[in-house]
Amino acid sequence: MTTMPNWLKQRAFLTPERIAVSDGRRTKTFAELYEAAAVWARRLAQAGVKEGDIVALLMKNRIEMIEIIHALFFLGARVLLQNVRLTSYELGWQLDDSGARLAIADEELAGSLDGDGRVLTVGAVAALPEVDVSLKETCDLEEVATIMYTSGTTGTPKGVLQTYGNHWWSAVGSALNLGLHERDCWLAAVPLFHISGLSIAMRSVIYGMPMRLQTSFDPKEANEWIMRGDVTIMSVVAAMLQRMVAELGEARYPDTFRCMLLGGGPAPRPLLEACKEKGIPVYQTYGMTETASQIATLAPEYSLTKLGSAGKPLFPAELCILKDGKPAAPHEAGEIVVKGPNVTKGYWQRPEATAQAIRGGWFFTGDIGYLDEDGFLYVLDRRSDLIISGGENVYPAEVEAVLLSHPDVEEAGVTGVENETWGQVPYAFVRLKRGASPDEAALRAFCRERLAKYKVPARIYFVDELPRNAAQKLLRRELKRLIPKTEQTF
């Protein structure tokens, strides 16, 4: 067992008057954040939350979300972060699978969990009386702090276990790579329910660094904060960065802005060239929920000479490429395998999936890539067939499962198609049962009832057969060939 002082308690002790978080309207110091989190903890104890419980949060970015996360840490509870874009069915499934004791939701989101007796709105929790409770003063780095569900290539959602140690070493690795400056302030315009957003909140208390919080991404406001020198680091995906560059116009960021951390897949060359011309320091990254954020990062000086690369592994992580169980040669494609204290210990109540993913201390990502002769990582396929749409992961198997649940559908295949706005969008290919009539609008409506909006196929094509290999395995990479040539843009 390796313990250390509770991060927020220790930070409030070390630098109580330093700014912890601001949303442009409200600002809180670490001392104020600590006091607020303690109040939430005493209210949540009144609601019956105790050590070891799993408590779900369905909230958009706001200061109260950060306070409640730390409040649950004070009680020794595990925090299940839920994506606000999911459907009621998807959210309810996560609650049932995790065995969550309680779900806390923003007032406008509580309807997504309507009828579930475990749900309390943030306002309802705020109205609870406080009870005397002993707040945990330490954290065990081996204990699970947070859980985030990821569907994986099987389409079956799995809860990724993120320990305090995972978050700690992710923060340390990032600091050793990016450095830590006295005037640093990290802008969180990405959702806190994603690891990219949550990692900023964790780093804030570990570093003693203020964070700026956007409820939802606003490129104009983000640029204004950067131009004023209020922000020095920002996490984005390519679609966000494109909007910021367009909104920036002929202006240039001040020297106070030192890092644009770009995730969600390699950026298109024109965007990188525009950033280089404007002097925007872009750091491309590779990471996932299972690695508690970035595990490899490309420094800006290599952004064009190593175009498309995700860089090199961060301290103290390791990364290699395996082909047929052996180390691959430079430029030889194979599976990306990673190791380090920021890597998950496994999946919630999924021992078989955990054993398949973690072997000999190495995490097999399922992603395909290669290392060049200088050791720079290039990712070829994200989780084989993973679609990344606007920074959100869309797993074809999950969408296919919904399509196959329709009584008229015999077969279904889903793949990603390039899109200027979102990077990729899902396209579906369906073979109907005999006698059924094709109705794209009705089938998309069926999907909208069961899937988050970004997972709903942008187009559905009706075909006579789907491409399969000799073993009858669906060849998703061949699906785009089924798009009529008059509609192809690739």
From Swiss-Prot:
GO molecular function terms noted in the UniProt entry: ATP binding; o-succinylbenzoate-CoA ligase activity
SUPFAM superfamilies, A to Z: Acetyl-CoA synthetase-like
Keyword check for Electron transport: no
Major enzyme class: ligase
Catalytic activity: 2-succinylbenzoate + ATP + CoA = 2-succinylbenzoyl-CoA + AMP + diphosphate
EC number: 6.2.1.26
GO biological process, one term: menaquinone biosynthetic process
InterPro entries: AMP-bd_C (IPR025110), AMP-bd_C_sf (IPR045851), AMP-binding_CS (IPR020845), AMP-dep_synth/lig_dom (IPR000873), ANL_N_sf (IPR042099), ATP-dep_AMP-bd_enzyme (IPR050237), MenE (IPR010192)
Keyword Nucleotide-binding included in the entry's annotation: yes
Keywords, comma-separated and alphabetical: ATP-binding, Ligase, Menaquinone biosynthesis, Nucleotide-binding
Lineage top rank: taxon: Bacteria
Pathways per UniProt: Quinol/quinone metabolism; 1,4-dihydroxy-2-naphthoate biosynthesis; 1,4-dihydroxy-2-naphthoate from chorismate: step 5/7; Quinol/quinone metabolism; menaquinone biosynthesis
Stored HAMAP family: MenE
Annotated function: Converts 2-succinylbenzoate (OSB) to 2-succinylbenzoyl-CoA (OSB-CoA).
Family in the record: Belongs to the ATP-dependent AMP-binding enzyme family. MenE subfamily.
Name this protein carries in UniProt: 2-succinylbenzoate--CoA ligase
